[in-house]
């Protein structure tokens, strides 16, 4: 299973670090994903959920 938020679709993205001389190097920005158990179609299932989804109440834990 890929590390993508089941509810919001948030995932790892690539970005650049920029120095004062505007040199660039690649970096990755990772979301704060938590493994949680939720009810999906009446059955408990473990999925990845972003901390933002958990805080906003989009996720109902078992």
From Swiss-Prot:
Key word Nucleotide-binding present: no
Biological process GO annotation list?
Answer: translation
Q: Which Pfam families match?
A: Ribosomal_L28
Organism superkingdom: Bacteria
Q: Name one GO cellular component term.
A: ribonucleoprotein complex
Q: Which keywords belong to this entry?
A: Ribonucleoprotein, Ribosomal protein
Q: Name one GO molecular function term.
A: structural constituent of ribosome
> Looking at the keywords, is Magnesium present?
no
Write out the similarity annotation. Answer: Belongs to the bacterial ribosomal protein bL28 family.
HAMAP family from the entry? Ribosomal_bL28
Record-given protein name: Large ribosomal subunit protein bL28
**Per the UniProt entry, what species is this protein from, by scientific name?**
Streptococcus mutans serotype c (strain ATCC 700610 / UA159)
